[in-house]
Amino acid sequence: MVDQHVTSSAGKPSVVVLGGGIAGIAAAIFLRDQGYPITLVEARRFLGGRVFSFTDEETGVSVDNGQHVFLGCCTYFIQLLKRLGVFQQWYLQPRWRLKVLDRAGKAGLLAAAPLPAPFHLLPALLTYPHVGWGDKVRVLAALVRARFTDRHQPHLEEISFYQWLKQHGQTEAAIAKLWDLVIVPSLNDHAREVSASMGLMIFQEGLLRARHSADVGYAAEGLSPAIGEPARRHLEAAGVQVRLGSPVQRILIDEERVIGVVAASGETITGQLYVSALPPQGLWQALPEPVQGLPFFAGLQRLETSPIVNVHLWYDRPVMEDDFCAFVDSPLQWVFNKSAIMR
């Protein structure tokens, strides 16, 4: 939510950014670059949102709050890492490579060939062992259709990606063992639960546009030292006021204009412009009741989450060679070899 109606006669208007996750960090850096005085307000004692690490009390080992990855097509995130000077603390595959196993231990490999997009996918699809030849032909036909479909058509927001796939001849096996293999880690849900527009976006931008779009990247050290801590140092060095431990309790609105935010401590923080990078529920709860009922904001309360269960296991010996792998026909979706990943 941005109040766009306030101007300042003395230089750029001051901006309060609500939320210190990745979106809030990026917004604060961008606006500070434009010369705006910035105050960044974050509920927790650190920046990074859900991209953080903590020390396990029993082992003393630094543990990430779940495994976070990005793709080569996430150009804005890559730019952010470079701007913070921490890109070298992350790893990005030189080419897309994904090992896929089933319950029986049969392994398949999806990898980008040294061919121009989208033909770089062809060898991997033709040799992928987890779907039959009939499915492979139908998958290739659907990928061609996906590449040339305008994902911004309104009706594609009204149907699920699963429905779009079924309309284009995809079987349950192909959806579970190939399409969802990409959709679940990208959109944090299955094809049945995401719009056709979003599903098409993932395949168009992540797989079909360029040969390196699907290259997988991840932090090579703990998440907090890889982004949250350097982000705070960067922002403070740039003159941004970083207010940690300040949960936003209420957003004050007068005559359809935001005039301040009240922190849980009771302090009122004011600026001339306001940007919300809060989670949907957090934003909705902070709004005055009359504003909560407005059509634009009422939908925030109806948004549902799709939680991820992360299990951290310590072994007394190496148990896998790959940095990570994916699974089909299993409630287990991905396994990451943290000993290999953490440099």
Where are these regions (language model features)?
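Helical element adjacent to the flavin cofactor pocket in flavoenzyme catalytic cores
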Residues: 201-265, 269
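Short loop/edge segments at beta-strand edges and connector loops
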Residues: 19, 94, 244-246
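Mid-domain catalytic core of redox enzymes
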Residues: 2, 11, 96, 246-343
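Glycine-rich active-site loop/strand segments that organize a redox cofactor
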Residues: 49-72, 140, 145-148
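Conserved Rossmann-like nucleotide-cofactor binding loop
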Residues: 23, 46, 281
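Glycine-rich FAD pyrophosphate-binding loop
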Residues: 32-57
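N-terminal Rossmann-like FAD-binding beta1-loop-alpha1 element of flavoenzymes
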Residues: 13-40
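Mobile amphipathic helical/loop "lid" adjacent to a hydrophobic cofactor/ligand pocket
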Residues: 77-78, 82-201
